[in-house]
């Protein structure tokens, strides 16, 4: 694969740059602005990759890879399991690559995973293992998903936040849908 959870950051960046026929310094990576991502951020800086840090909205952050106008090439890091499933559902509609792996902080989490039928606690899940059929995703922005820190000031926001126009509240909703049909 081009990008893989088991590859180093350097290998993933190098593979992506080669695929896009560009230099790592022309790539933009998006991550949640969290202390747990310090090592990843340091490695990206060493490779001279442009970095966009967002304060929250990991689903929105993941979606920034879906279209060129968002100017994000890769979203990576550690986030929540439910958010990963939501991001996978949305990215499925854009034919994007996604991998995820559970990280268990407590024995209670492992027990809950086993109760849900998960037997391999180290398993790397491909998008097709997370989303196994039709995929519909809707997202309405309540808060802004603009970068908290970025060395690329041209990154575009995914959705506009709620606007108050004389007590009429306007929202913008992103809807993605991928339905599989059969000839049977």
Where do the language-model regions lie?
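Conserved small/polar residues in nucleotide/adenosyl-binding loops
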Residues: 180-184
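Gly/Ser/Thr-rich active-site loops/lids in small-molecule metabolic enzymes
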Residues: 55-59, 72, 79, 83-113
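Solvent-exposed alpha-helices and their adjacent loops that cap or buttress functional pockets
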Residues: 19-24, 43-46, 65-70, 127-132, ...
């Amino acid at each position: 694969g081009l990008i893989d959870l088991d590859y180093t950051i350097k290998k993933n960046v190098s593979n992506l740059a080669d695929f896009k026929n560009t230099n790592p310094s022309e790539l933009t990576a998006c991550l949640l602005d969290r202390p747990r991502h310090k090592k990843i951020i340091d490695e990206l800086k060493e490779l001279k990759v442009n970095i966009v840090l967002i304060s929250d909205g990991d689903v929105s952050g993941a979606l920034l890879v879906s279209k060129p106008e968002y100017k994000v090439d890769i979203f990576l890091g550690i986030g929540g399991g439910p958010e990963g499933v939501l991001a996978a559902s949305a990215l499925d509609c854009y034919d994007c690559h996604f991998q995820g792996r559970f990280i268990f902080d407590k024995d209670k989490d492992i027990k809950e995973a086993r109760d849900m039928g998960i037997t391999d606690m180290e398993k790397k899940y491909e998008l097709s293992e997370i989303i196994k059929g039709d995929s519909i995703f809707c997202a309405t922005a309540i808060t802004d998903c603009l970068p908290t820190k970025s060395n690329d000031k041209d990154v575009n926001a995914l959705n506009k936040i709620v606007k108050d126009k004389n007590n009429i509240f306007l929202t913008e909703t992103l809807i993605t849908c991928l339905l599989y049909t059969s000839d049977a």
